[in-house]
């Protein structure tokens, strides 16, 4: 109570921040008139003036008012759009590396231009991040005229671009792209062998659109570049037959409960019971996949166990038309937050292969991780990070904790007039959908458009069937119809339009009341007459006014999402820029959120009220209880994301060390000093193994040392002979003599090859060894991560154990890199340029002969009475119709003559 009173007197922290920004807005407004008088050339010339001032030491903050005034004036001239005062505040929030929460329709794309322009003045590059390629290209093309007018270059990165195009896009002042593309380019840059093949510059400043979707919803999805490994598709196909035989254990609390697996729906986790293990082992023995008497948990059978778990998850957890769709011969993942399909994305840990087996499509090979990171760790690499969204305040704590980003709620330009009605809760899904259809019919009869948000493709199609039966015209926007997205959204605001859409997050398009005039004008084409354009504008104005008079857009939610933010995003589609509108959520006790987290309590309440089929309960107390359940789920999801980050932070520290070393190797022209240091460490380690430090002669294993040097390094070290010849050759002098032998071998090779070629060879060896061992290390880390939770059963802290073991693994990796580099350089046989040319010429000649033999063999196998294959001897000159001298029995022109 006291806190509320103080807030009313002093204002919230957000209010105080907005008040501070308004003082700077006043300065920008004072400059407006003088900037309005400037010519186009003088206005665009301000960019080079600002750059000069920054180069002389002025700060961005000192030129902010002028820079924002320039962008506002430029936008008015080029695009016919003037930034509102609240949009200027949004630009300041972004410039300070914070998150601007702005309601739908408040012009986030235009707001970004302010901070983007200001930070691009440093010529270090600014990245504008969107959720998909379509929005990246759309926003770049939309804002390009403004930026180019202000003498700024604009580029777009997208999947499928060649390296030169991508590099050029990154060299622009402003680069648009998706979070995936920026992240994957970062990983790819750390896999190239030449500095000139890198495409990204240092990560300077980033503005993330739909920041909650990218930094929170997708935070659990790692970015992985992978390569194929050994094919195990047949195992998935066989084990897929097992999954339908397994029975869920219904009540885990009762003793004697029967079942093969326990499924925790709230955690989306699944575990085999004791009965389940026995059943699976018996079945695998019957199928000949497991030896009699062997355990599924034996070290050699962990791959089988992995396949069993993956197939069980595919059948129980992953649902068709909810988690994925089948398109042709492929399984395509559906983004649970946006309802979009994610072509090219695959689940890891064998899940995707198991789903492919379940649906009977071609099973693609499993993959090995070559490089990986998370969005959390990638975006924390930027010097300055900011973001925009319509709904961030509910996740403000997480943004602050994980990314150090404050959330500032930007006041709306006009007062929100949307009415948010209490939820209606029904006993069953059927009752709920019947009520939704009645509501839709009533709203449509009033001449208002309706947007219905569903959580899955399955629900959108179910509701569509209800509406078809009632004869209600409607459009469905889900992962299966995403090609028509722009067209459907453009018409969604027309009078009486009904649009069913899976989660509207990240759609990037506002629903304009009366229909989207700009889209309709574009359809008319460039050749449209003035009369046609005016007629269309008049028609749109009449439609817009009729929808406003009827009450605006009505939003219907078919169930509550786990996150309040997603619900708020759906609601926010109505009431844009002060328009009227309304929203209501329809729930049933069979909805996932209700069923998993709170149905028993509400069910008892509904029974106590004597509710019957078709009746609903509507009460603020119920809506509050649901919100409380959502907070609980959000808290759980935050813990999961935080835990993921804590584990990935360990890997990230290692990743940064490896990537830093890799970069240093690429920029260095001479790595001989590094090689020398490695050689000394490796030789010391080698000698210590057979001649322990400060030991007596009897403890020395000279024979073992000679053998290892010969087998591992290809060097003859007559250590026993040296000791025999020189009785005073003690440990240290002997150690030095062995090192000198390695050094002499190295110098001899360098002299033969030439200094420059040998330096290039060293660099190549270092990079290749580092990459190969890093990939193996990632795989080991993955395996460690997957099984580390089992340490909890031994009363050990899994997180601490993971940190300890991963550190040990990393130390081992660094030692192994040194060892293998020295091993390769010492074992390599070096020829002079002349010798190399002779060997290459001989190789080419042999290759030509081999090719001839291979082709001859393949032709010979098709003939009826072929003889032995040719031995590659030279043949005398023969006529084309004469028998081939190889002895095949064919004419020369049909045999070896066909190759000439």
Swiss-Prot record:
Zn(2+) binds at residues 884, 886, 895-896. GO terms for biological process: intracellular protein transmembrane transport; protein import; protein targeting; protein transport by the Sec complex. CDD domains: DEXDc_SecA (cd17928), SF2_C_secA (cd18803). SMART domains: SecA_DEAD (SM00957), SecA_PP_bind (SM00958). It comes from the Bacteria. Keywords: ATP-binding, Cell inner membrane, Cell membrane, Cytoplasm, Membrane, Metal-binding, Nucleotide-binding, Protein transport, Translocase, Translocation, Transport, Zinc. Its EC number is 7.4.2.8. It is a peripheral membrane protein. Residues 860-872 have a biased composition (Low complexity). It holds the Pfam family SecA_PP_bind. Its main location: membrane. Disulfide bonds: none annotated. Belongs to the SecA family. This is Protein translocase subunit SecA. It comes from Marinomonas sp. (strain MWYL1).
């Amino acid at each position: 109570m006291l806190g509320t009173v103080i807030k009313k007197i002093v204002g919230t922290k957000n209010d105080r921040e907005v008040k501070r920004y308004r003082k700077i807005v006043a300065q920008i407004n004072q400059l407006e008139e003088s900037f309005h008088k400037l010519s186009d050339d003088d206005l665009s010339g301000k960019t080079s003036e600002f750059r000069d001032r920054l180069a002389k030491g002025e700060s961005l903050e000192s030129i902010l008012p002028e820079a924002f005034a320039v962008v506002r004036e430029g936008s008015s001239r080029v695009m016919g759009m003037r930034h509102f005062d609240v949009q200027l505040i949004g630009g300041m929030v972004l410039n300070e590396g914070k998150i601007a929460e702005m309601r739908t329709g408040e012009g986030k794309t235009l707001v970004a231009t302010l901070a983007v322009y200001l930070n691009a003045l440093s010529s270090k590059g600014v990245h504008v991040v969107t959720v998909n390629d379509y929005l990246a290209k759309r926003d770049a093309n939309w804002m390009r005229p403004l930026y180019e007018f202000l003498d700024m270059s604009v580029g777009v990165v997208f999947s499928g671009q060649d390296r030169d195009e991508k590099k050029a896009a990154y060299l622009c002042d402003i680069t648009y792209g998706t979070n995936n593309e920026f992240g994957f380019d970062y990983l790819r840059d750390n896999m190239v062998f030449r500095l000139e093949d890198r495409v990204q510059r240092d990560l300077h400043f980033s503005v993330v659109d739909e920041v909650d979707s990218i930094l929170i919803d997708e935070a659990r999805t790692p970015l992985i570049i992978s390569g194929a490994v050994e094919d195990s598709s047949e195992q998935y196909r066989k084990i897929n037959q097992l999954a339908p035989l397994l029975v869920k254990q219904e009540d885990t609390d009762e003793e004697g409960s029967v079942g093969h697996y326990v499924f925790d729906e709230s955690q989306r986790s699944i575990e085999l019971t004791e009965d389940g293990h026995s059943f699976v082992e018996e079945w695998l023995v019957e199928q000949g996949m497991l030896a009699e008497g062997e355990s599924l948990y034996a070290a050699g059978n962990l791959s089988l166990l992995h396949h069993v778990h993956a197939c069980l998850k595919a059948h129980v957890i992953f649902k068709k038309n909810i988690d994925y769709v089948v398109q042709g011969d492929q399984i395509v993942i559906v983004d649970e937050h946006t309802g979009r399909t994610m072509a090219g994305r695959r689940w890891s840990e064998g899940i995707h292969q198991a789903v492919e087996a379940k649906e009977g499509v071609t099973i693609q090979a499993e993959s090995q991780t070559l490089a990986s990171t998370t969005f959390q760790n990638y975006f924390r690499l930027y010097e300055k990070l900011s973001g925009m969204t319509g709904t961030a305040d509910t996740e403000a704590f997480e943004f602050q904790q994980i990314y150090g980003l404050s959330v500032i709620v930007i006041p709306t330009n006009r007062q929100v007039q949307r009415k948010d009605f209490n939820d209606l809760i029904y006993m069953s899904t059927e009752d709920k959908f019947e009520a939704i259809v009645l509501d839709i019919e009533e709203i449509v009869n009033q001449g208002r458009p309706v947007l219905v948000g569903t959580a899955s493709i399955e629900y959108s199609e179910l509701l569509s069937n209800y509406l078809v039966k009632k004869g209600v015209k409607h459009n469905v926007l889900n992962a299966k119809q995403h090609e028509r997205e722009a067209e459907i959204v453009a018409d969604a605001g027309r009078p009486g339009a009904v649009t069913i859409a899976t989660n509207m997050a990240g759609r990037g398009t506002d629903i304009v009341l009366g229909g989207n005039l700009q889209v309709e004008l574009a359809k008319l084409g460039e050749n449209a007459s003035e009369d046609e354009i005016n007629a269309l504008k008049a028609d749109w104005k009449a439609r817009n006014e009729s929808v406003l008079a009827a009450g605006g857009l009505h939003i219907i939610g078919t169930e509550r999402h786990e996150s309040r933010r997603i619900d708020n995003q759906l609601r926010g589609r109505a009431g844009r820029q002060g328009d009227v509108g309304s929203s209501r959520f329809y729930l049933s006790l069979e909805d996932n959120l209700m069923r998993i987290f709170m149905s028993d309590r509400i069910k008892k309440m509904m029974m106590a009220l004597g509710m019957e089929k078709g009746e609903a309960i509507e009460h603020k107390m119920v809506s509050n209880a649901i919100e409380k359940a959502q907070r609980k789920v959000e808290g759980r999801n935050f813990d999961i994301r935080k835990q993921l980050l804590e584990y990935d932070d360990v890997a990230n520290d290692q990743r940064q060390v490896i990537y830093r070393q890799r970069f240093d190797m690429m920029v260095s022209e001479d790595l001989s000093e590094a090689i020398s240091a490695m050689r000394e460490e490796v030789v010391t380690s080698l000698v210590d193994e057979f001649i322990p430090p400060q030991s007596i002669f009897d403890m020395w294993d000279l024979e073992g040392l000679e053998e290892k040097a010969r087998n591992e390094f290809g060097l003859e070290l007559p250590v026993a002979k040296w000791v025999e010849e020189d009785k005073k050759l003690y440990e240290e002098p002997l150690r030095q003599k062995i090192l000198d032998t390695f050094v002499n071998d190295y110098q001899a090779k360098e002299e033969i090859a030439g200094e420059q070629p040998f330096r290039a060879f060293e660099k190549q060896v270092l990079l290749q060894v580092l990459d190969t061992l890093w990939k193996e290390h990632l795989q080991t880390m993955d395996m460690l991560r997957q099984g580390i939770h089992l340490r909890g059963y031994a009363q050990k802290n899994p997180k601490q154990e993971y940190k300890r073991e991963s550190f040990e693994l990393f130390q081992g990796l660094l030692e192994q890199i040194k060892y293998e580099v020295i091993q390769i350089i010492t074992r390599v046989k070096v020829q002079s340029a002349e010798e190399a040319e002779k060997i290459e010429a001989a190789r080419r000649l042999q290759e030509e002969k081999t090719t001839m033999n291979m082709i001859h063999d393949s032709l010979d196998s098709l003939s009826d009475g072929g003889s032995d294959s040719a031995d590659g001897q030279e043949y005398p000159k023969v006529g084309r119709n004469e028998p081939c001298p190889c002895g095949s029995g064919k004419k020369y022109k049909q045999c070896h003559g066909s190759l000439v």
